Amino acid sequence: PIPRTLAITLHGDMDLCIIDEMPMNRKPITTKVVGEERLTRVYDFIKKEVQSGKQCMIVYPLIEETEKSDLIAAKEMYNDLSAKQFSNLNVGLIHGKMSKIDKDQIMYDFSNNKIGVLISTTVIEVGIDVPNSTIMLIEHAERFGLTQLHQLRGRVGRGSDKSYCILVRRNFSENSKKRLQIM
């Protein structure tokens, strides 16, 4: 359970219900932690999966790059990935500064497999159920909390196909490595 839910349960404000098995026909999600040097191989894997009819979500911590931060942003990577690595795939972009109408249209297109690769911020953390989406790639994973990473990972693995959550770490500190390996 996530820390907030555990605290509420322990302090008597919520009943405890143990779910000890996965929904029917679902497989466990394979979670991998990789360094940025392996991204070319990861992108090749994504291309292969999307070309076979599956879908992928790629999450970035920022909408736009800033001078104060060395983090990679969703808008810039949307432009880069859709022009280079995924130029032959349908790539979409969604983030919190978009209008509700635009976000709804992007999610409708993604849900109906018109978009193979969805570049996003954490706006997709909850409420997304696309069984055909089998890959979640999270950039700068060390910058997210474990609860957030768990929520994001939960966006894949909702169908009967094997699913993957790939955590890209760009901070190679031992502490961030250990924290991500908990996932």
Task: Go through the PLM ranges and name each one.
Residues 1-182:
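Inter-lobe coupling/hinge segments of SF2-like helicase ATPases
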